[in-house]
């Protein structure tokens, strides 16, 4: 672990520093510590611009460990693939990992089964599940799965729209960053 001090534009400084790390760890602000101004979107800006994985720890996280029970939110994208492989050192040491896919209806096969098989070949204790959205958003379905599994880490690909479109429409990454159910490991 290394701590650094730098001055300047917060986004530029963090992005530059993150490029020389294995993992950038940020705490989510809360209460009087809610970021304002340019640091408001720092976690999403950092994951999109640094080329490095980012771990966002919720302000109210009280767990004693991170990475023992892991949920991977899988959609088959290059971002999800990147997150999966960036988190491999954590996944290989985890007690239990669940790959979830989320969709509006039942499927004949579990879309994340191939991904789970790939992880099992790396010695990961893994299972796969398909979660039905029902009357909730994709982000809510993911959060429910994290809580139901007792996960202490959520791994996912940070898929981003332009800031304007994301402000208007939201987005799964945006929703998870605003209300993470557990520490959140993101890659882009």
Q: What do these predicted ranges mean?
A:
Residues 5, 74-75, 103, 133:
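Conserved residues at beta->alpha junctions
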Residues 6-9, 38, 79-82, 137, ...:
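Short secondary-structure boundary/capping elements
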Residues 12-101, 179-188:
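Intrinsically disordered or low-complexity boundary/linker segments at protein termini
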Residues 32-33, 104-109, 133-136, 162-163:
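Short, small-residue-enriched loops and turns at beta-alpha junctions
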Residues 38-42, 111-113, 168-173:
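Charged helix-capping and loop-helix junction motifs
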Residues 76-129, 140:
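Redox- and metal-dependent alpha/beta enzyme cores, enriched for Fe-S-associated oxidoreductases
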